[in-house]
Each structure stands twice: as structure tokens, then as C-alpha cells.
Amino acid sequence: MFRNVQDILLLGRGFSYAVANETELKIMEASYTNAKAYSSCDYPHGPIATTKRFIPVIFFLTDEKTNDSTIKLVEKIKKDFSVSTLVVTNNEKYITMANEAVLLPKEAEGVAGVFGMAVFSQLFACLLSLARGYNPDEPIGLSKTTVTF
């Protein structure tokens, strides 16, 4: 589903949105694939217009306090745009919502979910890099330090 795509969307809310942002960076760094993270509560207010059938979407669902808006968005995007979807969740009831799913331990809820999603993100970026023929340990142009002006 992801090996030959040029773009990937990542959606989550709360802690999941923070992980989506980090996943965006890891995907771009390791596999040179354009990735963009959005908050699932902000996405319907503009960026949804850029949704394309050929751009797969990864949804992060590991916090029952914030999952509702993301669940509604999964349903809307699948219905209106017929995109390929992957759900990363700790709840079995959500795995059938998407084309593909990664089931984390049920204990990966809220703050604890960040750690499960982070492991997924690292492995996903690494495996995508390898599938595309790149070495994830030698990203082109990566600076390990930031410069402050």
C-alpha cells in the first residue's frame, strides 16, 4: 500500500497528533516520501479538499478522550474519497474501520499510547525506506543539530 506512493497523510488528535507530526518527519527523513500530518479536528476545515484517492492515510487512535473526531474522519474519508487507510490503534473495535490496521496492546492508551505509536512510527519509516531501496541509517542531507540565529 505504501511502497510506491509519493505522498502519505497522517491524522490524529491530542497525543496522537504529536506522534503524527514526528512520524511525518521520520517518513520524509528515511524514505524521501512526502508526508503531511494534520490534527483530525482541523483537517475537515480546509486541508480535506486536498484529499486524493491515490494518497493513503494513516490514522492514529489510542486515546478514547480524543478518538471521536478521528473516527468520524476515517468514516468520511473512506466514504467520500475511497482512499487506502491504515489505523494504528489499541482498540480491537477500530481495526475493521480501515483497509489495514496495526493493533497495539490495549494498555497503550492516552500517554502510554505515545510509546506504542512511536515504536510503530520508527519501524514504519525504517521498513518503508528499505522497501524503497534506501538506507535508513544514512539519510541524505540530515543535520543532527539545529542552528539558532
For each feature predicted by the language model, list its residue ranges.
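A SIS-like phosphosugar-recognition module
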Residues: 1-149
